[in-house]
């Protein structure tokens, strides 16, 4: 009986080893991190919705480029279906680093990884992501700083809706996009949704900066009801389509951008940024976060220097 028990135990162990080996063989084809395989890699765990996903892609790609490393996305939580939902809007995106299942066991137990988290500093540049001496690093966090990548170099994706959005903007002769984000930002503690006074100030500033430019506006928003209730926005186009990537591409297609809080507006502005504030403007609210989120946010790491910030008073 004892011999049979021992044999069964060995059989279970042998079966587990074979399963691990089979998983690692497929895993090696797409992400050679396990069991000491050679190569420099940067893997990123993407989080959030479209804007946050773009931050993770751009920043991790920039870090991989700085480290002369390969780059991919790691599925450690089985969110592949969610990720596919977002990449359908992009012309290209990082490949999946690994298969789930036994490959995950191999990854976490045997791989000589340097796991780095932003530790709540979601919008602050941290050199540790770039300077790690390990050949393979796995990053987790929002990575919301343009300093992680070179804004002057091409980012590794484009919005599929970009051409359609340019046509949409051109037919209507729109020159200014206003992004108004409210929704969850009204109740999520630490976020500061800009009041109406901010948008009035931004429009006035834009007129002062470019007095000769005709101003035809489109408002891209998640709260069209609130927009329609404001007389200041009367006569402006309002857009909230079923395709967030199209809405983002419309912001990018406009010459000037007035953005709100959140990563969605940031990427809409950045993807259409000329880099020259003498010919076009990106205007943003300087007050983005309050306690408890303010400690993880740095305006100078988040907003490019040539963008224009506006200070405003919060309305009661």
Predicted region positions:
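Histidine-anchored nucleotide/phosphate-binding helix
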Residues: 53-65, 199-207
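Secretory-pathway luminal glycosyltransferase catalytic domains
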Residues: 40, 76-214, 303, 310-316
């Amino acid at each position: 009986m004892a011999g049979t028990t021992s044999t069964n135990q060995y059989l279970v162990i042998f079966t587990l080893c074979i399963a691990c080996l089979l998983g690692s063989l497929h895993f090696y084809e797409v992400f050679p991190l396990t069991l000491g395989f050679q190569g420099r890699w940067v893997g990123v765990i993407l989080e959030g919705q479209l804007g946050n996903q773009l931050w993770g892609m751009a920043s991790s790609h920039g870090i991989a480029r700085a480290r002369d490393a390969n780059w991919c996305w790691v599925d450690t939580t089985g969110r592949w279906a969610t990720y596919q939902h977002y990449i359908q809007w992009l012309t290209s995106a990082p490949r999946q680093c690994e298969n789930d299942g036994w490959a995950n066991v191999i990854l976490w137990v045997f791989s000589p990884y340097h796991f780095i988290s932003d530790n709540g500093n979601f919008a602050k540049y941290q050199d540790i992501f770039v300077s790690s001496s390990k050949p393979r690093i796995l990053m987790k966090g929002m990575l919301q700083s343009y300093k992680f990548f070179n804004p002057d170099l091409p980012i590794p994706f484009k919005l599929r809706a970009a051409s359609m959005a340019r046509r949409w903007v051109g037919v209507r002769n729109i020159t200014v996009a206003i992004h108004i984000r409210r929704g969850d930002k009204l109740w999520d503690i630490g976020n500061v949704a800009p009041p109406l006074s901010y948008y009035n100030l931004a429009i006035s500033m834009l007129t002062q900066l470019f007095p000769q430019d005709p101003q035809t506006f489109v408002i891209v928003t998640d709260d069209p009801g609130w927009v329609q209730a404001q007389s200041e926005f009367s006569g402006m186009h309002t857009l909230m389509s079923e395709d967030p990537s199209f809405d983002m591409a419309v912001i990018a297609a406009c010459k000037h951008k007035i953005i709100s809080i959140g990563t969605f507006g940031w990427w809409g502005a950045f993807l259409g940024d000329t880099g020259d504030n003498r010919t076009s403007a990106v205007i943003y609210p300087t007050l983005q976060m309050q306690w408890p989120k303010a400690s993880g946010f740095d305006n100078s790491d988040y907003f490019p220097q040539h963008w224009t910030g506006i200070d405003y008073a919060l309305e009661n």
